[in-house]
Amino acid sequence: MKFFQRPERRLKQWGLALLLAASALLPARADVVPLNHIVAVVNDEVITRQELAKRYDEVVRNLSRQNTPLPPRNVLEKQLLERMVTELALQQHARNTGVRADPTLVERALQRIAAQNKLDMAGLQAALEKEGQTLDGMRNTIRNELLIARARERDVDNRISVSDAEIDGYLQTQAQQGAETEYNFSHILVSVPENASPEQIRERRARAEDILAQLAAGADFAQLSASHSDAPDALKGGNFGWRASGKLPALFVEALKPMQPGEISPLLRSGNGFHILKLVDKRGLDATLSVTQTHARHILIKTNEITSEADARNRLLQLKERIDNGVKFDELARLHSEDASASKGGDLGWINPGDTVPDFEKAMNALQPGEVSAPVQSPFGWHLIQVLERRDQDVTQERQKLMARQAIRERKAEEAFQDWVRQIRDAAYVELRPID
């Protein structure tokens, strides 16, 4: 069983600057909503003028830190409201389909943020208050981000698979193109709704062409991204950072390949809408690759009509107690594991980054050698995981297939994610009201 073939997706690393900028999710919602301040209705919830104003102030602070010229207030507010609507629709989808944010994970995230910034919780609270925020507001932000991240893992990332035939095709294409290139570029997206009418497509194309004309006249790319782009990275100036060509859509690669740093692409059309790219820099990839490999073993209990989630978890808790009391892990794996590795005492051999499903890899990476995890849920059931050892390995010989698998997975996951967001947004009942 290839329970350890994972899509390329991780929860974002928490950082104080990111959360203070509120670049991901909505701030805490008030219990009492003044009706005359409603600026949007999303299904059975509302967004208020006060929430929009708070989000605006946070984003302005963030753009100012980045030295990004500010768009006109009315333009940025409209952009932010659209983003808040989409985020709320995603949160609702997650909650309505059974996703929950574990309070323990929320508190751990807060503690990590404080530790990363060399603060205790009181210091973190003081830092937030200087930015006009609260600890409870940050908790809500983290909770909402966890909801969306878990829903994405379940609905998108864990359903991505990469076949050997796809890897072979990728490597053949790379061989024909020569050495792979990395691109540092920025991006503006004018999205087109699914099943858009010809009139909607013409309107979106006109918007994109107007942006392109402004760029040709010398307008600031980051400012136009913040005010007009529908992409998730719009409020960061649209910058993608460094991406290997194999992890990008072919449409982008073909546009970027002949460009020189500082140049802007013509209008590009994809299933998601109209794209404009600006090349910041490009470079060849390093020919060598060293990765941290993990030697691990596990015990898997599958769930079915007879074995419930709770039953599987409780069985593993009992097995972990026996391991903690001195019973050998491999003996229990041979007796109880329902994975093909049971005959080998649950031994999975050496695992590379990107080999396992997100839930499994995240839990495995948190363990020290010799440590046994608490029960971990994955799409395949419930696991106990033990890390035996780790090593840094020069995998130059394996590099091509490893990079190919990760590149294909990341590209497919990103495309599927954009489709997923668009479908949820289009399916939501949305009523936009005047902001002022």
Swiss-Prot record:
Pfam families: Rotamase, Rotamase_3, SurA_N. Its EC number is 5.2.1.8. Coiled coil: none annotated. PANTHER family: CHAPERONE SURA. It catalyses: [protein]-peptidylproline (omega=180) = [protein]-peptidylproline (omega=0). Residues 1-30 form the signal peptide. This is Chaperone SurA.
